[in-house]
A protein has these predicted regions:
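Bacterial N-terminal signal peptides that target proteins for export
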Residues: 1-8
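Bacterial N-terminal signal peptides
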Residues: 9-18
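Boundary at the C-terminal end of the N-terminal hydrophobic targeting segment
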Residues: 21-23
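Extracytoplasmic substrate-binding proteins
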Residues: 32-36, 41, 51, 136-215, ...
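Structural recognition of the beta-strand scaffold that forms the well-ordered cores
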Residues: 62-64, 82-85, 125-129, 149-153, ...
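A short, structured surface patch at a secondary-structure boundary
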Residues: 63-121, 125-133, 232-235, 243
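Alpha-helical, coiled-coil/dimerization segments enriched in small aliphatic residues
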Residues: 220-246
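A contiguous binding-surface segment within folded domains or other stable secondary-structure elements
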Residues: 239-293
Length: 367
């Protein structure tokens, strides 16, 4: 099956001028459905290299990292979440897919686990982000009460896919996880094939704004990895940045020296902030009005905790190298992606809202 997908991807690449092609047509079959797979014991390895053994696939999930709630939903088990973090309740498509999410308890905030709330939720497994799992005081709470926990972390796309597949085993939905990672790998292959002949000195120089105008990507992160896969030169990667915890910031003088040709931003309104700020006026991307908001669906595409990174790769490559991707119907690709992996049927209006980063995340005080 994998070989067959590869051959069809190659055919798509050769038929660049075929009308209305879409990048994932061979991977997209239908929405994730089906029952929990496997009844016996299972063993997985998490991001910290810990081995977790369960007697059977879990049925009650505490998702103390928003990414893991997205994965559980992707695997068709969103209704089995019993505890979440606040950020998951902001995502409108998650609200649509998991209608009861607003009533779920929030047993962790700011990396601190409120064990009484978590115990009342009675999870079979607790999914943690690495920062929380690194705090011994927090994991001791879980160990004291015998709660199994899994660290969902990654620094690049391969590690992210491995984490998703391990979670697929925990959820009893390994086949669904493999369907998603197969699509992910196929998209990387497609885009790399189409951009591989562009000389390094002719690749578009891109700056990626993360939440704030001057927050950006460092080397050794998944953002550095996926922007490389999109065929661009990410100007901040490998250069000196100011670190604040796990966040990285560029100085304005450095951005002017980099002089990116394209800027992509993942926070609504930051594109206009950059375009209107006189300090950015000398940047080529600003002068040529090539400052674009990144689409937002289940989450911000290409954000560290995003499951839409395959779409972010395609969208970015198509935005900066339109002639190489003119045959791909991006709107259809988006509809098929969300239908297969989240069982969502998107209207044309919803697709445009995703592409324009409009109204897809709910303000916390609006609930």
């Amino acid at each position: 099956m994998k070989h067959r997908r590869y051959l069809i991807w190659m055919l798509i690449f050769l038929l660049l001028h075929a009308p209305a092609a879409h990048a994932g047509q061979t991977a997209v079959t239908g929405p994730v459905t089906g029952s929990v797979q496997g009844e016996g014991p299972l063993t997985v390895t998490d991001f910290f290299g810990r081995t977790l053994t369960l007697e059977r696939p879990a049925n009650r999930f505490a998702c103390l990292y928003a990414f893991t709630g997205h994965v559980v939903t992707l695997l068709g088990r969103g209704k089995d979440m019993v505890a979440v973090v606040d950020g998951l309740k902001k995502d409108r498509l998650i609200q649509q897919r998991v209608p009861g999410i607003q009533s779920l308890p929030i047993p962790a905030k700011g990396g601190v686990i409120h064990i009484e709330t978590l115990l009342k939720a009675d999870p079979d497994v607790v999914f943690l982000k690495p920062e929380t799992a690194a705090a011994e005081a927090e994991t001791r709470k879980l160990e004291r009460f015998g709660l199994p926990w899994f660290v969902a972390g990654y620094r690049n796309m391969d590690e992210q896919m491995t984490t998703i597949e391990m979670m697929g085993k925990i959820c009893g939905r390994y086949d669904a996880a493999r369907a998603y990672t197969g699509y992910y790998r196929d998209m990387i292959h497609l885009v790399k094939q189409r951009t591989r002949k562009i000389p390094e000195d002719q690749r578009v120089r891109l700056y990626h704004s993360v939440n704030e105008a001057r927050r950006t990507d460092a080397a050794g992160t998944i953002e550095a990895d996926w922007t490389r896969a999109a065929g661009v030169v990410n100007v901040s990667v490998g250069n000196r940045l100011s670190a604040r915890g796990d966040k990285f910031f560029a100085g304005m003088e450095q951005i002017l020296i980099w002089n990116p040709e394209v800027i992509i931003v993942n926070e609504a309104g930051v594109d206009q902030q950059i375009l209107q700020d006189k300090k950015w006026a000398a940047v080529t991307a600003v002068q040529e009005k090539k400052v674009f908001p990144i689409p937002v669906g289940i989450s911000r595409w290409g954000h560290p905790g995003s499951l839409e990174t395959p779409l972010a790769i395609l969208w970015t490559a198509r935005k900066v190298y339109p002639a190489l991707f003119s045959d791909i119907d991006l709107e259809m690709e988006i509809k098929q992606f969300y239908h297969q992996f989240f069982d969502l049927v998107l209207t044309d209006e919803m697709v445009q809202n995703i592409l324009n980063n409009e109204g897809m995340r709910q303000a916390m005080d609006a609930r």
